[in-house]
Amino acid sequence: MPILLLERPQNASGTAKKYWLFSMSKEEKLLRACEEVKNLTYTQGAYTIFKVWEPKERLIMALPFYDRVVQHMIVNIIGPVFEQGFYYHSYACREGKGMHAASEQLSQWMYELMIKEGLRLYGFKGDIHKYFASIPHDKLKEENRRYIGDKKALYLMDGIIDKNGILPDGVGIPVGNLTSQLFANVYGNKLDKFVKHTLHAKYYIRYMDDFIILSADLEQLKEWRKRIEEFLEKEMELQINPKSTILYAGNGIDFCGYIHHPEYKKVRKASVRKLKKNVKQLEAGELERVEFEKKYQSRLGHMGHADTYHLTKAIEYELLFWEWEQTESGIAIPA
C-alpha cells in the first residue's frame, strides 16, 4: 500500500477543522482505511450537497473527510496506471499540467499556425454539455477495464461510481471528488483517442469538458465538428453544448480563463469587471482591506499570465491615489 501524505490545509476553513479532527486519531484511521481497502469492506459515506456560483453555477457533492482520505489513497494506487494511457494535451487535474499550461500550449500553437498559414486560422471551441452529470456508469466502467485488470480495484471503483449522491441511478459522477476527476479524465480520453487517431487532428487540446481544435481549413473543422457530435452521442452517450462554435482565431479564442490571440493573450472582460468591482467596494468601505488583498492578489496572479501590463498599472495607480486621499483626509489605512 503506497504511503499517503496527509498535508495540513493552509487556511482556517471547514476543511482545516476537519483535518484537525481527523488528525487527533490519524494513525488509527489510516490503518482502518488501509484495512477497508485491502479487505473490500470500504463503504462510502453520505454527501454534503451545496452549490457554487464561481465561475458558473455548479452542484457540489462533498464527502466526509475520512472518505476523501480513502479515495485519495485509491487514486494514488490506480492513477499512475491510467496516466500512462492519457493523451498528452489533456490538461485538467493532472500533475504537471493545469489551466496555465493549457493556455500556454494553445497560445504557442496559435502563433505557430499564424506563421505557417497567415491569417487563415480557425478554431472549433467545443464544450460537452453537463459532462460530469451525464457520464453513463456502464460505459465508464468499460473504459476503466481497458486500463485496470485487478478485480479488487475494479470492485472498489465500481462501488464509488455507483454511489453518486442525488444523481439518477446509472448516470453521473459528483463534481468535487478526487475519484470523479480521475474518472472524468478516463472517460474523456475516449474522445481524445477518436480526435487524434481517427480524425487525425494535429492541434487538439482538452481541459476536462472544454476542448479546442485549430485548423486553417474551415471546411475540415465543420466536418470534424459533425463527426465529434455523432461520436459523443453514439459512442459516449453525451451531448455537445449548443454554444460550441467554429470561429475565426483572429477574433480571439476563450479558453481556460483567457482570450487567446495568435500574438497575445488577454483576460476575460468578466475578470476585469470583478477586479474593478472589488476596487470600488474597497473605496466605498464595503470590503475590508484584508479581504480585498486576498482577492486582489489572486486576480493579479491570474492576470500575470496574460498581456495586462497597462491594465494592472492603471489599477495600481488608482489604489495609490485612493490611499493618498485617505492619508490626506486623516483616515487610517489598515496594513
Language-model-detected regions and their locations in the chain:
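A generic secondary-structure signal for well-formed alpha-helical elements
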Residues: 77, 81-85, 144-152, 164, ...
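Conserved two-metal-ion catalytic palm core of "right-hand" nucleic acid polymerases
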Residues: 1-140, 165, 335
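Conserved polymerase palm-domain catalytic core
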Residues: 29-32, 36-37, 89, 104-208, ...
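Helical (often loop-to-helix) elements that flank the catalytic cores of nucleotide-handling enzymes
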Residues: 218-239, 268
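Surface-exposed helix-capping loop/turn segments at secondary-structure junctions
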Residues: 84, 197-203, 236-240
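Right-hand nucleic-acid polymerase module
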Residues: 72, 163, 168-169, 222-223, ...
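A generic structural signal for residues located within well-ordered alpha-helices
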Residues: 65-69, 179, 183, 251
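Short, glycine-/Ser/Thr-/acidic-enriched flexible segments
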Residues: 67, 218-219, 260-261
